[in-house]
Amino acid sequence: MANIARDIFKAYDIRGIVGKTLTDDAAYLIGRAIAAKAAEKGMTRIALGRDGRLSGPELMEHIQRGFTDSGIGVLNVGMVATPMLYFAAINECGGSGVMITGSHNPPDYNGFKMMLGGDTLAGEAIQELLAIVEKDGFVAADKQGNVTEKDISGEYHNHIVGHIKLKRPMKIAIDAGNGVGGAFAGKLYKGLGNEVTELFCDVDGTFPNHHPDPSKPKNLQDLIAALKNGDAEIGLAFDGDADRLGVVTKDGNIIYPDRQLMLFAQDVLNRNPGAKVIFDVKSTRLLAPWIKEHGGEAIMEKTGHSFIKSAMKKTGALVAGEMSGHIFFKERWFGFDDGLYAGARLLEILSASDNPSEVLNNLPQSISTPELNIALPEGSNGHQVIDELAAKAEFEGATEIITIDGLRVEFPDGFGLMRASNTTPILVLRFEADTQAAIERIQNQFKAVIESNPNLIWPL
């Protein structure tokens, strides 16, 4: 039996610490396992790309050898943003591709996001890869798969510039956090006719300025300062592999992705009345009424880019988004999460206004907390912890308890959420209400539930 760290096989992807849990041998074996699944589905070619992390080239070499030793051909697109890899996979490889990325994890992490035949691998499909590795269930190849190298950045760029039309040129600031999006974002937005101020757009896998995670307010402070001190009208920020978008207004307000989705949904519904819109369990309770008000069907899903993509395929939804910043357009695009493209769609909408910040600031808003995290004791299972807490929890005044992903408790004047993260050993909490008093009341109810487990420390 092959020796591989089981805990790198996560819910949405494979992710580990390079050289410790994610080794060169592991990359090779994972390549063999993905190739076995591809062969089973009759696929002969896989697109392969990497982000700007320092460990990317070496991992790429070993996973690629896993493919070719199994007789699977490789379209190697080099260093790209994750959505560019998806673009190559869909247009050149029948929807099969692997992206080597650590997303927003610390610099010593890396991993693989995978799709086969247009389906993103998640949950059980990822556990099947582990089973193949552990049982040596690899395919024997008659001959080596061949490798073709291709720069797809031009095609990707032209595809977007070809159909996104701004009403006027805008002045924008972008912050790539030294992630791979910095290699492409400036050129893309200039190609749409904008004047672009670039922050931290040189790709550097050590992330020397701030962490490339736009879901955390501290990582947007440089962009906020640039907007206040310069003449840019709007700020866009990206995570390490540019499949997530952060948005900041001229006056320094962070427009979280659930509010971004209000604007995107309204735009899509203008052209497609009755369309389905998907959002994740962490989203504002103001979103579903907004979607219905604008003639759409609102669907809540569990958090996770692979789950959302799967739900989009199942329901035929035209647009979706989740609180972490993944925005998915099926209308006029391919249905995968793409921070660069979402930025372009946002500029297309905002260019119709002389005051884009006003448009964003006028979107409905409640009082809410950012995402709050509770560290779990070493070796504990977050989903099990949630189940144990939920079993004895009581919520006075609750109107609905939603259990599709953790516990979301709705009240007449707000909601509280606790769920297990699928990527890190933490519980995630979020609260929203009409008033500060209501948010504190809801938090206190959750605090009592959390503190029933002596190993958990309330984060506020």
Swiss-Prot record:
Keywords: Carbohydrate metabolism, Cytoplasm, Glucose metabolism, Isomerase, Magnesium, Metal-binding, Phosphoprotein
Sequence positions that bind substrate: S103, H104, K113, D243, R244, T303, E322, M323, S324
Matches recorded under Pfam families: PGM_PMM_I, PGM_PMM_II, PGM_PMM_III, PGM_PMM_IV
GO cellular component: cytoplasm
Cofactor note: Binds 1 Mg(2+) ion per subunit.
Binding positions (Mg(2+)): S103, D239, D241, D243
GO process terms (BP): glucose metabolic process
EC annotation from Swiss-Prot or TrEMBL: 5.4.2.2
Transmembrane regions: none
Cofactor (UniProt): Mg(2+)
Primary localization class, coarse: cytoplasm
InterPro entries in the cross-refs: A-D-PHexomutase_a/b/a-I (IPR005844), A-D-PHexomutase_a/b/a-I/II/III (IPR016055), A-D-PHexomutase_a/b/a-II (IPR005845), A-D-PHexomutase_a/b/a-III (IPR005846), A-D-PHexomutase_C (IPR005843), A-D-PHexomutase_C_sf (IPR036900), A-D-PHexomutase_CS (IPR016066), Alpha-D-phosphohexomutase_SF (IPR005841)
GO terms for MF: magnesium ion binding; phosphoglucomutase activity
Function: This enzyme participates in both the breakdown and synthesis of glucose.
Family classification: Belongs to the phosphohexose mutase family.
PANTHER family named among the record's database cross-references: PHOSPHOMANNOMUTASE, PHOSPHOMANNOMUTASE_PHOSPHOGLUCOMUTASE
Protein name in the entry: Phosphoglucomutase
Provenance organism: Neisseria meningitidis serogroup A / serotype 4A (strain DSM 15465 / Z2491)
Gene that this polypeptide is encoded by: pgm
